[in-house]
UniProtKB/Swiss-Prot annotation:
It is found in: Mitochondrion membrane. GO terms for cellular component: mitochondrial membrane; respiratory chain complex I. The chain crosses the membrane at residues 1-21, 26-46, 59-79. One of its GO terms (biological process) is ATP synthesis coupled electron transport. Disulfide bonds: none annotated. Belongs to the complex I subunit 4L family. Keywords: Electron transport, Membrane, Mitochondrion, NAD, Respiratory chain, Translocase, Transmembrane, Transmembrane helix, Transport, Ubiquinone. Core subunit of the mitochondrial membrane respiratory chain NADH dehydrogenase (Complex I) which catalyzes electron transfer from NADH through the respiratory chain, using ubiquinone as an electron acceptor. Part of the enzyme membrane arm which is embedded in the lipid bilayer and involved in proton translocation. The keyword Transmembrane helix applies. This is NADH-ubiquinone oxidoreductase chain 4L. InterPro entries: NADH_UbQ_OxRdtase_chain4L/K (IPR001133), NUOK/Mnh_C1-like (IPR039428). It catalyses: a ubiquinone + NADH + 5 H(+)(in) = a ubiquinol + NAD(+) + 4 H(+)(out). Pfam families: Oxidored_q2 (PF00420).
């Protein structure tokens, strides 16, 4: 495993561990998801440049576009949750109530 690959794997695992262990606020969960997507984007871009393949050259841009859509959807859910419940605490959200 190269040094660069280890760095991006560690960044992804830190985002994943932050997502699993720190589930108090919706905003912190969204930030962990964005960190994971950023590490995936950089790793995919580095992989495409190392292999010098033109077949997968559009994959990082597609991942970046999906990440932007995910961020927009997450922020809209954050605003809707803050308006409906008054805060973004995940413990206050009960999915069984309408």
């Amino acid at each position: 495993m190269t040094h660069i690959m280890f760095t991006f794997s560690t960044a992804f695992m830190l985002g994943l561990s932050g997502l699993t262990f720190n589930r108090t606020h919706l905003l912190s969960a969204l930030l962990c998801l964005e960190g994971m997507m950023l590490s995936l984007f950089i790793a995919l871009a580095m992989w495409c440049t190392q292999n010098e393949t033109m077949m997968f050259s559009s994959a990082p841009l597609l991942l970046l576009a999906l990440s932007a859509c995910e961020a927009g959807l997450g922020l809209s859910l954050l605003v809707a949750t803050a308006r409906a419940h008054g805060s973004d605490h995940l413990q206050n959200l009960n999915l069984l109530q309408c």
